[in-house]
C-alpha cells in the first residue's frame, strides 16, 4: 500500500501544489500570510520517499546537527530506511531553492490517540521557518492525529511557546557495566 494511502487524504484548507522536480510528487504547504513576513519565499515540503535521494546529503547535515544533542539512539543513516518505506516522514524548509532545515516526523498510533512525533528538527534561519509549524499541525489533523509531541531539549519550550512539558525522559548509561 502506498505511503499516501496510509496517511489519508488531505482535508486541510492549506493550499497545496506540486512545483519543480523535487516537489513534483511531494505535498507542498505554503502559507501566503507567513510567506512575506520576513521577506522570504519559504516553502515547507513533505518530501515523497522517491524524492529523498537527491537531497539526502543536505538532509544529513541537518540531522547531524540534531543528533549531536541526542543520547545516540539513531545516526543520520538510520533514518533513511524508515523514510524510504514511509514509516517516518521528511519535511524540508526551502527558501528560494536553498534547503535551510529538515525535520523528521513519525505517526504514533497509541491505543487511545494518534500523535505526530517530531523525531528530529534542525537547520539554519529557524526564526524564518519555525512560524510554518502550524501548517504541519494542519497536516497532522488531516491524517487523524490529535496532538504533536517532540522529544527535545528544554530550550524548545522557549521557541514552542504554546506547547507544554508533559514529562521528562530520564536516562542512565549502562555501557560501563557491560564489560
What are the residue ranges of the model-derived segments?
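Active-site rim helix/loop that mediates acceptor-substrate recognition in acyltransferases
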Residues: 69-88
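Active-site/acyl-donor-binding loops of N-acyltransferases
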Residues: 2-21, 25-28, 150-179
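Acyl-donor binding region in acyl/amide transferases
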Residues: 111-162
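Short, solvent-exposed loop/turn elements at beta->coil junctions and helix N-caps
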Residues: 78-80, 106, 155
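Short amphipathic alpha-helix that is part of the acyltransferase structural core
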Residues: 14-74
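A residue-level signal for beta-strand positions that form part of recognition/binding surfaces
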Residues: 41, 115, 167
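Conserved donor-binding loop and adjoining core beta-sheet/short helix segment
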Residues: 84-126
